[in-house]
C-alpha cells in the first residue's frame, strides 16, 4: 500500500508532463486494463470505468486526448528505445497503427472507453478488421 498521504501523487500524468518528464502509458494488467481505449479514457477523464467520480479523481491531473494518445504511442516507443522504428506514422518506420470507429479527438471524452477498433495494421499488413453490423 502506498498510504493515504501519497494517493494524490498516483498517476500524476499532468504534473509529470508539465515538468518535462518523459512518461508513457501501458497496460499493467491486472492492475489496470489491458484495453488502450480504456486507459486513454482514464488519463483524460480521471474517472473509473463506471464514470466515477463525476468530476474525475484529482481533476488537476487530467490530460488532453492528444497527450494521452502520445503516452501510448510516441512516448511508449521512446520508453522502450524503439522510437526510430515505432511510435509515430512516418516514412521508414513500422506501419503499426489502428483505425478507430470514432475520432476520439472530437467525441465526448466519456465515449472514448467504448470506442471500438475497426482495423489493426502491423508492419503495413492488415491483421484485424472488425465486422461492422449493418
Q: Which positions does each model-derived feature cover?
A:
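His/Asp/Glu-enriched, well-ordered alpha-helical/loop segment
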Residues: 1-110, 115-123
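Residue-level structural signal for beta-strand termini and adjacent loop
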Residues: 132-133
